[in-house]
């Protein structure tokens, strides 16, 4: 937001340097990016008058001019301009001067004739014909009656090119500061000066606006207020110099008096406005509605745009005439032959305007303001200000009254006045009276222990916001430095300790940690082959997604891990072993935030990895977390996993982990052309069952005995069942049991499989004999016979 110093002084009188103004405004919360004086690169250019014009003897297009610059002697300048005549008052760049763009002007000779400077065009002063409409674009700028023609006067002062422009960075929560009056209010409070913003009022009116215009709002949830006024006998002409100067200083190009009035009011009050040519408004009716399917509009920039049904438009009885809050239609613009206009001052839903502007690729000054949710109470005041300017500029005849359709919520924001809370929160000691005074300087009301925020401060929501206002104008530099009191007790929580342990175990097992987005596409569930009614498809939907690929929150991190494996596989990495402690999201209804469980997701592929590698990683994790009592069962009905190479680990009836080889179809859907393996381990179940303490086990004093056993059993018998029977039968003497072979094929009966275990036996009290080991083996063989298994011969 550019602020004109000259315009600012219309509302608040400040006697401070430009640097101090920038520093103090920044300190009070209105950040100044930069400030500069208009035409600062133009130096030693003054006002002069053409005394005589003589043809150059050696040129058919050059003129020798004698110029009076208010000095004792005239100066001679040679020019090629063809628009000059005697007595014209012009800008004169003297010897050793600089014009716009940093061009250095020195005296010299043109075809043998001395020239002691240069006569300037608008472009050489950094201006255009929009700044001085009566000037000639490609000729010397001849000063008009709206300029100071005192000879020898600095050109900056003569043509009003001496304003100081301050650029502010306005944050999204302070839409009120996207206006001159808003920044004037901040400046008045910062420098403790009087703020004067006159209430706009017009005097001359005729007729009744209802005879010219009617308004209907069909979408009150998207258009909170719409006010309109009519001006007849419009006299389209250039705006006066003072208005053009202010618009130029704020970065807006002057066009004509009617358009300039709408831009002037937008800059002054922060309320976007638009002027419609009434003759192109069919039925003389304004209808605020959503666009119809397939509807199009050609906007003021001459581009035809296809509208979508969710976009809000301003329409007449037959067609859209403007994209609400963004830009007017081609035929809504003001032309030289316009006679009757409608001024629009409205309040639209910020989210709707932002989405429309983004979809159409046309972010404008108006949409940039509407996006930030403006003050609906400002609509009428802005409309009255526009009518006042019409009267002041003699731009037309105002029709009496305004049409005002108001659906806005006028409930003010109120908060308790708690000075002590503010002091404790900020760390200052400011009296209640002083706090009240600060708030009243920025138009807050404090009565009976209640603070009422002004309608233009829609960013005020909490007591902390009030504290910020107090701190801003009390002075951040006055808040004393104070060391933090108390002792910071920095410790890991039990869950954080577990996560750290999990990470350490995974890294020690050779896995690399990854971090993936929690946003995914619904199509990922199709790639996982999840049924349409699967609970894992019940996702939290994003209201404003970056795109379809990031439109929902994942309920499982498996697709994210498979994407990582796919990326590595297709980059020709021969193997990958990854893990992530990943967050998933499970909806809990529209009134509650979603549940956010964490799971350990593991992904493997490569020749050296198989199902048992994955199982071994999880078993190591369970060992390190002290979980020894768990069950493993085969899984055949999970669409993600291979039906013959998947398992579920449960603890106390709760699923701790799901692991296995990825189903070939699922792997294909993720463009993985090799066997890959995934596991998902519940951090919640792991935390609930992790051992609280580690039990010390002394180093063994006696040697171990190792025996191998191979059994033949039905293919349907789970290996874990065999392991448990052996462990139960052998007892404490069994130190460890390891599965080292599963075989099906030749020499094994159909429907059967061979399972081989290695048993490690050790006693705490003695060295085991062969008889001891044989006795343990007999117990193991007898135990598995309960499951229909027999010792393989």
Predicted regions span which residues?
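Mobile "lid/hinge" segments at catalytic clefts and subdomain interfaces of large enzymes
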Residues: 114-131, 135-141, 164, 314-410, ...
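Conserved mixed alpha/beta core segments that line enzyme active sites in large multi-domain catalysts
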Residues: 47-76, 245, 256, 262-331
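Glycine/proline-enriched, intrinsically flexible loops and inter-domain linkers
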Residues: 4-5, 23, 63, 196-295, ...
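Phosphate-backbone binding interfaces of nucleic-acid-interacting proteins
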Residues: 1-207, 342, 361, 365, ...
């Amino acid at each position: 937001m550019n602020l004109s110093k000259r315009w600012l002084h219309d509302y608040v009188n400040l006697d401070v340097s430009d640097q101090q103004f920038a520093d103090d405004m920044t300190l009070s919360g209105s950040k100044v990016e930069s400030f500069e004086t208009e035409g600062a690169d133009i130096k030693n250019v003054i006002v002069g008058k053409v005394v005589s014009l003589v043809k150059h003897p050696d040129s058919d297009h050059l003129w020798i001019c004698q110029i009076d610059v208010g000095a004792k002697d005239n100066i001679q300048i040679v020019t090629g301009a063809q628009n000059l005549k005697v007595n014209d008052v012009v800008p004169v760049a003297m010897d050793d001067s600089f014009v716009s763009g940093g061009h250095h002007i020195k005296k010299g000779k043109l075809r043998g004739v001395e020239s002691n400077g240069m006569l300037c065009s608008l472009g050489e002063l950094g201006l255009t014909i929009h700044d001085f409409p009566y000037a000639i674009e490609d000729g010397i700028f001849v000063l008009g009656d709206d300029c100071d023609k005192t000879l020898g006067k600095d050109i900056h002062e003569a043509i009003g090119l001496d304003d100081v422009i301050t650029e502010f960075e306005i944050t999204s929560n302070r839409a009120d500061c996207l206006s001159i009056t808003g920044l004037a209010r901040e400046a008045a409070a910062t420098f403790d000066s009087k703020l004067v913003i006159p209430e706009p009022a017009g005097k001359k009116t005729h007729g009744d606006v209802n005879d010219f215009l009617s308004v209907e709002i069909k979408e009150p949830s998207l258009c909170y207020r719409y006010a309109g006024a009519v001006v007849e006998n419009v006299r389209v002409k250039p705006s006066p110099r003072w208005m053009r100067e202010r618009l130029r200083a704020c970065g807006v190009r002057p066009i004509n008096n009617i358009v300039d009035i709408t831009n002037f009011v937008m800059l002054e009050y922060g309320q976007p406005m638009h002027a419609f040519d009434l003759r192109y408004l069919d039925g003389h009716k304004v209808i605020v509605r959503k666009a119809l399917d397939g509807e199009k509009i050609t906007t003021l920039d001459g581009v035809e745009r296809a509208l979508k049904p969710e976009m809000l438009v301003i329409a007449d009885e037959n067609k859209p005439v403007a994209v609400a809050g963004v830009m007017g239609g081609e035929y809504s613009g003001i032309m030289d032959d316009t006679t009757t206009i409608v001024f629009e001052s409205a309040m639209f839903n910020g989210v709707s305007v932002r989405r429309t502007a983004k979809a159409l690729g046309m972010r404008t000054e108006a949409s940039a303001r509407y996006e930030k949710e403006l003050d609906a109470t400002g609509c009428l005041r802005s409309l009255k200000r526009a009518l006042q300017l019409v009267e002041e500029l003699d731009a037309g005849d105002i029709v009496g009254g305004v049409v005002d359709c108001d659906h806005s919520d006028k409930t003010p924001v109120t908060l308790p006045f708690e000075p002590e809370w503010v002091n404790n929160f900020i760390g200052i000691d400011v009296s209640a009276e002083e706090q009240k005074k600060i708030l009243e300087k920025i138009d807050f009301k404090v009565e009976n222990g209640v603070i009422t925020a002004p309608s233009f401060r829609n960013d005020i929501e909490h007591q902390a916001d009030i504290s910020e206002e107090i701190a801003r104008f009390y002075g951040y530099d006055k808040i004393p430095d104070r060391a933090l009191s108390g002792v910071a007790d920095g410790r890991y929580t039990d869950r954080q300790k577990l996560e750290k342990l999990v990470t350490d175990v995974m890294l020690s097992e050779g896995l690399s940690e990854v971090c993936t987005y929690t946003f995914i596409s619904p199509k990922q569930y199709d790639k996982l082959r999840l049924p349409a009614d699967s609970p894992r498809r019940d996702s939290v939907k994003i209201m404003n997604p970056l795109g379809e690929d990031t439109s929902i929150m994942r309920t499982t991190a498996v697709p994210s891990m498979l994407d990582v494996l796919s990326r590595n596989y297709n980059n020709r990495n021969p193997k990958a072993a990854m893990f992530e402690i990943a967050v998933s999201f499970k909806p809990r209804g529209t009134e509650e935030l979603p549940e956010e469980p964490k799971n350990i997701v593991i992904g493997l592929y490569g020749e050296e990895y198989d199902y048992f590698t994955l199982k071994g990683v999880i078993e190591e994790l369970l060992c390190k977390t002290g979980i020894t009592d768990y069950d493993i069962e085969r899984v055949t009905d999970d669409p993600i996993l291979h039906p013959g190479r998947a398992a579920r680990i449960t603890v106390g009836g709760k699923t701790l982990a799901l692991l296995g080889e990825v189903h070939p179809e699922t792997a294909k859907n993720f463009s993985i052309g090799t066997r890959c393996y995934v596991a998902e381990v519940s951090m919640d179940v792991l935390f609930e069952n992790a051992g609280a303490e580690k039990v010390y086990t002394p180093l063994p004093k006696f040697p171990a005995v190792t025996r191998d056993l191979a059994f033949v059993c039905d293919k349907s018998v789970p290996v874990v069942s065999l392991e448990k029977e052996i462990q139960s039968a052998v007892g404490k003497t069994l130190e460890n049991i390891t599965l080292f072979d599963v075989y099906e094929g030749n020499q094994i009966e159909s429907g059967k499989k061979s399972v081989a275990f290695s048993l490690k036996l050790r006693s705490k009290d003695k060295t085991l004999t062969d008889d001891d080991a044989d006795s343990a083996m007999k117990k193991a063989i007898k135990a598995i016979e309960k499951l229909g298994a027999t010792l393989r011969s």
